[in-house]
A protein has these predicted regions:
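A short N-terminal helical cap/helix-turn-helix that marks the beginning
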Residues: 1-23, 41
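Conserved AMP-binding/adenylate-forming core of the ANL superfamily
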Residues: 22-72, 91-103
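Hydrophobic/aromatic ligand-binding patch that stacks against planar heteroaromatic rings
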Residues: 76-77, 105
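Structured binding elements
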Residues: 81
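Conserved ATP-dependent adenylate/AMP-binding module captured primarily in the ANL superfamily
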Residues: 85-117
Length: 118
């Protein structure tokens, strides 16, 4: 029997919804966590957005700083069937070079869409 990634994530959300799926500790040593239910719900929202804005197999640049926000974006990309290309947001203190580096990554990867936190 073949089980898809979506099936596995859905099952964990149903069976272990309240359990911690991921945790992130910031530099101030504060922990933020994401349950399986929250991860699945957020990943489905991201997947729905990506399905409207791109096609399966297309490359999507996930431009997120370190933290939990990246996780549902990455899982949502997998649910949507897109290929994730992860990159840190450019540091404005570095000037144009930071943006040039990000543009080079996007061009080299052939991304069709950039997804970033609000």
């Amino acid at each position: 029997m073949t089980t898809s990634f979506h099936d596995l994530l859905q099952r964990r959300a149903a069976e272990d919804g309240g359990k911690k799926a991921f945790a992130f500790v910031d530099r101030d040593e504060r922990e933020r966590s994401l349950t399986f239910a929250a991860l699945y719900a957020q990943a489905r929202q991201v997947a729905a957005l990506l399905r409207r804005a791109s096609a399966p197999g297309e490359r999507v640049l996930l431009m997120f700083p370190p933290g939990l926000d990246f996780v549902p974006a990455f899982y949502g990309s997998m649910l949507a069937g897109t290929a994730s290309v992860a990159a840190y947001p450019p540091d404005p203190r570095l000037g144009q070079a930071a943006y040039a580096g990000l543009l080079a990554i996007a061009a080299d990867a052939g991304v069709s869409l950039i997804l970033a936190p609000r």
